[in-house]
Amino acid sequence: MRFWFVLLALLGKEIYAYENERNALNATAANKVCGLSTYLKGIAHRVNSESAVVTEKLSDLKMRSIQLQLSVMRNRVPSGEQDCKDIRTLLKTVLRNEFTFQQELEEMRNASALAAAAAGIAAGRLEEWIFVFAQAAGGSSQFCISVGTNIPAEYNNLQECFDGTIGPETLYKIEDSRVKESAQKSLQLHEVLSSISFSSLGAESIVEKGENRGCNLMRTADGGLLKDVCLNRNFTWGGGVLNFGYCVAGNLKIKGGEYGDVGSHDAVRWTEDPSKVSIFKDVIRLFARFQEVKNAVVKKIKTTVDELTKCIGQKEAELTNDQLYEEFEVIQKYLWFL
């Protein structure tokens, strides 16, 4: 009789532990999420710098146009160039293109603003998630981000997230050097997104299992996010990165999948394909649109500059921008008085 009593007591203890374990997020995954957030913030710098390059190319086109006009006025257009025979048509085309390029440049700037905004929103969603988890820490073994010991993760364990003691003021800002450096990396958006996929991280780098850390933020059953009930719908962190069924009791059995793959009340899914996560879809679409518009404008400007360059006289080609403006103004004044 005593044997069965002890066995039942042990079984009861195991069941109780299973139902009430509140796992913590692994600091490895938290740092990866923050690294992605930093990269997304860097997109704002990237689109701005690439837009500035296109603006410079358009300015160069205008200078080439002035060089050509000076060459025509001084009768110094290279006579051997077949493409320079109909110089009047070429000039008309250039002037018409300059107006078109200004409109396309404005379209590119609008596209860059939308891409930067989408990236900023996505970065904010990720940052808020990790910030909430990092702050959810008690003085003992109760916390929501784990480094595998009985103490919570501190800022030195989350250096991809915080530039000092955990707090809102130490989150990396868009003007910080780390963000600017991220913008200069040659990594493509899809590469950075894939770094947080389930297959890239693995379950052991996402959730600390087998320990009760008291983190109610990863529990949707009663005694979790709400006091005495399960939720009435599925739940997500990071806009679709970490997804929970509506009644997850703890001891997470995490698998790869998306928010729409959470088919049972106790399922937990970490994104397998970040390009399907809602907050990243706009970034992918709008950044691709910016690149498309930018590349089209750059190609047209280059073609026009190449056509102009063949017909510019050697002396005009050697003039600095200041010299060009000065001589062009002199000739315009002379023509005005004729």
From Swiss-Prot:
Gene Ontology biological process: symbiont-mediated evasion of host immune response
One Gene Ontology term, aspect cellular component: side of membrane
First and last residue of the signal peptide: 1-17
Function, in words: Transferrin receptor subunit involved in receptor-mediated acquisition of iron from the environment by binding host TF/transferrin.
Subcellular location per the Swiss-Prot or TrEMBL entry: Cell membrane; Flagellar pocket
Sugar-bearing residue positions: 26, 110, 234
Protein name: Transferrin receptor subunit ESAG7
Taxonomic source organism: Trypanosoma brucei brucei
SS bonds (residue pairs): 34-161, 84-311, 144-215, 230-247
Keywords: Cell membrane, Disulfide bond, Glycoprotein, GPI-anchor, Lipoprotein, Membrane, Receptor, Signal
Xref: Pfam families: Trypan_glycop
GO MF terms held by the record: transferrin receptor activity
Domain of life: Eukaryota
